[in-house]
Amino acid sequence: MNFPQDGIKLHRGNFTAIGRQIQPYLEDGKCFRMVLKPWRERRSLSQNALSHMWYSEISEYLISKGKTFATPAWVKDALKHTYLGYETKDLVDVVTGDITTIQSLRHTSDLDTGEMYVFLCKVEAWAMNIGCHLTIPQSCEFQLLRDKQEA
């Protein structure tokens, strides 16, 4: 069985079937690590679109303040550096087989909707702190989640 990178959505209805799929892996006596955590959907396209709109708005603001290097791509990387951090990856040289461990920025596509909401809240707070007021469309998922939090 190939396990999806995002994991398996385990519930009462598929528990037995998944157990049958996993059983062959245990036949040779090997042990495995299994992590259970509440299921959350990956960050949404709405959240991604909002973040990219904000990167552009922040870029325009910073450029207007003399920071001409602050392209939307630079803003995106700077915010990910500040609020998401890095992950470690091992890369293999296909010719020599040498393994190099690198640090790379975390990807928002790896966040769930809750983690992305927290990231967006941090970005918004930072932007407000520097005087950059970001657009939040009334019907976007970020605003709907905020309304739910404040209810």
From Swiss-Prot:
Domain of life assignment: Viruses
InterPro entries listed in its UniProt record: NinB_sf
Family from the record: To E.coli ybcN.
Name this polypeptide is given: Uncharacterized protein in rusA 5'region
Organism the protein comes from: Enterobacteria phage 82 (Bacteriophage 82)
Organism classification: Viruses, Duplodnaviria, Heunggongvirae, Uroviricota, Caudoviricetes
